[in-house]
């Protein structure tokens, strides 16, 4: 519910209308009701959903809402060891919290977010993007990728400003 509260806070201030889709008797999204979302700018769902149900209707959801409506999926990263990857059922944007991947809160933070998207949204992403590559010795390497010079030299033009400790934790989680 925390993510939904954040969505409401941002959308209310921007004058964006939010429609809530109904669930069926099993706690899954009502696919008949999902037709109302066609033509919206985006649909946000969580997997597992906010009441803990693994919703098997999401693969049909993208077909119902259409390609012009972004499907945004909030995930619990540990669950992806068992559940299908959201990209496989048409998610355009995937978000989650990286803390369960080895950033113990007992260490005093910091924590990091997970944010993935399809190619059309890639250059619109804020923050730092960790990419996997191969170094000069042929070994797997992780690096910050697709960051513009403004991120580092022009604070007023940067899309985000994060500090080194968060970057180190994000790199650790990516590995």
What are these regions (language model features)?
Residues 1-2, 27, 79-81, 100-106, ...:
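Short gly/pro/ser/thr-enriched loop/turn and capping motifs at secondary-structure boundaries
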Residues 1-12:
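Substrate-binding/gating loop at the entrance of the active-site cleft, primarily
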Residues 7, 16, 131-132:
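Active-site cavity-forming subdomains of large catalytic enzyme subunits
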Residues 7-8, 34, 43, 76, ...:
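Buried hydrophobic positions in well-ordered alpha/beta secondary-structure cores of metabolic enzymes
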Residues 10-21:
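A glycine-rich helix N-cap at a beta->alpha junction
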Residues 19, 23-78, 100:
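Active-site phosphate-binding strand-loop segment of PLP-dependent enzymes
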Residues 87-103:
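Conserved active-site segment immediately N-terminal to the catalytic lysine
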Residues 101-175:
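Active-site C-terminal subdomain of aminotransferase-like
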